Amino acid sequence: MIQQDPGALYSDHLAVLFRRAEQALARGGFDHLVVPSGTLHYQVFDDRDYPYAVNPQFKAWLPLTRVPNSWIVFTPGKRPAVLFHQPFDYWHVVPDAPSGWWVEHFDIHIIRKPEEALALLPADPSRCAILGEPQSALGSYVPNNPAPVVNYLEWHRGSKTPYEIALMRQAQVLGVRGHRAAEAAFRNGADEFSIHMAYCQAVGQDATELPYGNIVALNEHAAVLHYTELGRKAPQPLRSFLIDAGASAHGYASDITRTYAARGHDEFAAMIAAVDAAQQQMCAAVRPGFDYKQLHVDAHLSLMGVLKDFGVIKVSPQTALETGVSAAFFPHGIGHLIGLQVHDVAGFAASDEGGRIERPAGHPYLRLTRVLEPGMVVTIEPGLYFIDMLLNEVKDAGHGDAINWDRVDFFRPYGGIRIEDEVLCTEGEADNLTRPVFAAANG
């Protein structure tokens, strides 16, 4: 596994962004692309701010995630500018002076107060496509987020540049480091909060730096898809552990899930192994031209095959799919685009002009409906869960006879299983970004 230097790839990445921005501006009829980094948000009736989250459109250009009140200005034919907010402040740590692989490519203007940007932004705000949230408005420079510009940029963000893939590989390395520490803590009998802390320590990122809230679920808690409570006391006995957690690398996310059985719980361990084998086949199906919607449907059939083999369902996988039984055990989508955002944008877009590709009927939580293209990075995250609310709905719909309820009772205390990798669609075979990192770490 070779890690490429992102700095050596940045110039080509920027050239791609230039071309995209020029075309997007032409589509929208604007002269300038203006991207604010975002501002701090404060809690209601309080002077405490929420953790700052940078505008994704900003960090697409710069590997900076902690520079509120800054701006990027791109005008075709001109060198892009960065208005870098570095205030005089003795209450807080201010951003370091600009440095790194990006600085030589921009005209950099240091501003000490947010309003100093006004003299450096393009003269006519009406000629600017300003991409950001309303709170980023400064004087007459109010984010307008023109649809032709946003649609074009978001669609093409689906195809990652080599620079972006290099950073995503870095995020995998960090995430796997945390996952290994978390598994070790679980094996030592730790509670959910302690497992979470072991993860953060290994990654070197706290909860505000991680790309999403860690899901650290012991036993039945794994049946809550987005369980983030972090219990302070380990259940007894410990049966199972599901962890869905990622890491950030210069604004790019990883999103990795693993499930483990405690020692002595061999049948659940065998089910995990079966889901893992099925998941690897799904990862291999990531090829250019393949419809992600079909991959999702195929995942349902494969997972129902696992349940059939373990005696949980009595009907065929196809019947389970057609009757909605499969959705009770696998109630989320097979995955999503990932990159600057965990659930990256334009997953439903019909083209770079907009439009929408709807989800298949009966699958309301699928987050990607596009045909796969080279450069896309997607998650593949099949799961099987024992969720009473959904299983009761199967009974209410008259399909209770399709399920062996004794087997459900056996597996319910384990909560569920989810296995998730990130996979790069190439011109040929799928490139799993996650598995080789685990293999190297375990080697």
UniProtKB/Swiss-Prot annotation:
Identify the keywords attached in UniProt to this record, alphabetized: Dipeptidase, Hydrolase, Manganese, Metal-binding, Metalloprotease, Protease
Q: Which InterPro entries match?
A: Creatin/AminoP/Spt16_N, Creatinase/aminopeptidase-like, PepQ_N, Pept_M24, Peptidase_M24B_aminopep-P_CS, X-Pro_dipept-like, X_Pro_dipept
Residues reported to bind Mn(2+) 1 = D255, H336, E381, E420
Q: What does this protein need as cofactor?
A: Mn(2+)
Q: Example GO biological process term?
A: proteolysis
Per the record, what is one GO cellular component? cytosol
Q: Which Pfam families match?
A: PepQ_N (PF21216), Peptidase_M24 (PF00557)
How is the cofactor bound, as the UniProt entry phrases it?
A: Binds 2 manganese ions per subunit.
Question: What does the record give as EC number?
Answer: 3.4.13.9
Task: Read off the Gene3D superfamilies from this record.
Answer: Creatinase/methionine aminopeptidase superfamily (3.90.230.10), Creatinase/prolidase N-terminal domain (3.40.350.10)
Task: Report which superkingdom the organism of origin falls in.
Answer: Bacteria
Q: What is this enzyme's class at the first EC digit?
A: hydrolase
Which reaction(s) does its UniProt entry say it catalyses?
A: Xaa-L-Pro dipeptide + H2O = an L-alpha-amino acid + L-proline
Q: Where does Mn(2+) 2 bind?
A: D244, D255, E420
Q: Name one GO molecular function term.
A: aminopeptidase activity
Q: What family does the entry list?
A: Belongs to the peptidase M24B family. Bacterial-type prolidase subfamily.
Q: What role does this protein play?
A: Splits dipeptides with a prolyl residue in the C-terminal position.
HAMAP family from the xrefs? X_Pro_dipeptid
Q: What is this protein called?
A: Xaa-Pro dipeptidase
Protein's gene: pepQ
